Curated annotation (Swiss-Prot):
Sequence similarity: Belongs to the universal ribosomal protein uS2 family.
Natural source organism: Nitratidesulfovibrio vulgaris (strain DSM 19637 / Miyazaki F) (Desulfovibrio vulgaris)
Protein name (record): Small ribosomal subunit protein uS2
Listed InterPro entries: Ribosomal_uS2 (IPR001865), Ribosomal_uS2_bac/mit/plastid (IPR005706), Ribosomal_uS2_CS (IPR018130), Ribosomal_uS2_flav_dom_sf (IPR023591)
Basic and acidic residues bias locations: 229-242
Location of region: Disordered: 229-271
UniProtKB keywords: Ribonucleoprotein, Ribosomal protein
Any GO CC annotation of this UniProt entry: cytosolic small ribosomal subunit
Regions of compositional bias (Low complexity) in chain numbering: 243-271
Underlying gene: rpsB
Length: 271
């Protein structure tokens, strides 16, 4: 299992929180102290809590679940899109559309529209329309792609959400909580940890710190996927062995006992 070490966290500035005046008192248990007006996060706790979050991600994917990565702030967008794509998971890096999860049926209609437009441009069907209409459809497709591109293959709700900066992504947090979707989140000193199921106390503003955590969660997804495939392969192998095993011959029915020959009848001699 590829856990993140304290050395990696120190090198990427995970321990730097927000200014002391911009904090949520509920984060007090995860704060080591303050330096130059900046809260310093207790990395011993971060190391331990990251392992718990990592294992949750692995377990989710092992059991066939999918993870949605959410990070719409500028510092997180590239890392979230690249790493979620590498792991074969879903992601949202542009604006979080209200109802993305709680009104998923409507979102699916928009996804269907996006796929239809992509198909029209791919096979040339769009060329039947006038230039003005083509430009309108291009703008529509670009807009849908920006907001839904990372979830266009999501045909059901995810089983886990990984969020960078839950304070910023408060609408996504509310939707996950309403639907009972567990949340793993990089939680800075200005966040409310009570809203998060698996807190990773850490800097959610520094690009290097964000990349470290996002890549590690993507690795956890890949690890879970590999374990799931291995388990599936073993199950298939067991089924083949069972199918190939010779069936036990049915027990032979006991032959009926032979009847004893009848004793000859001796007639009494006449006197």
């Amino acid at each position: 299992m590829a856990y993140v070490s304290m050395k990696q966290m120190l090198e990427t500035g995970v321990h730097f929180g927000h200014q002391t005046r911009r904090w949520n008192p509920k984060m007090r248990p995860f704060i080591f102290g303050a330096r130059n007006g900046i809260h310093i996060i207790d990395l011993q706790q971060t190391v331990k809590l990251f392992r718990t979050a990592h294992d949750k991600v692995v377990d989710t994917v092992v059991n066939g679940g999918k993870v949605v990565f959410i990070g719409t702030k500028r510092q997180a967008q590239e890392a979230v899109a690249v790493e979620a794509g590498r792991a074969g998971q879903f992601y949202v890096t542009n604006r979080w559309m209200g109802g993305t999860l709680t009104n998923f049926t409507t979102i699916q209609k928009s996804i269907d529209r996006l796929k239809k437009l992509e198909a029209m441009f791919a096979d040339g069907t769009v060329n039947k329309y006038q230039k003005k209409e083509i430009l309108r459809m291009q703008r529509e497709m670009d807009k849908l792609l920006a907001t839904l591109g990372g979830i266009k293959e999501m045909d059901r709700l995810p089983q886990l959400a990984f969020i960078v900066d839950p304070h910023r992504e408060d609408i996504a947090v509310k939707e996950c909580r309403k639907l009972g979707i567990p949340i793993v989140a990089v939680t800075d000193t200005n966040c409310d940890p009570d809203l998060i199921d698996f807190v990773i106390p850490g800097n959610d503003d520094a690009i290097r710190a964000i990349k470290l955590f996002v890549a590690a969660i993507a690795d956890a997804c890949l690890e879970g996927d590999a374990m799931r495939k291995e388990r599936k392969g073993k199950d298939a192998e067991e089924e083949l062995k069972k199918a190939a095993a010779p069936k036990a011959a049915p027990a032979a029915e006991a032959a009926p006992a032979a009847e004893a020959p009848a004793a000859p009848v001796v007639e009494a001699a006449a006197e």
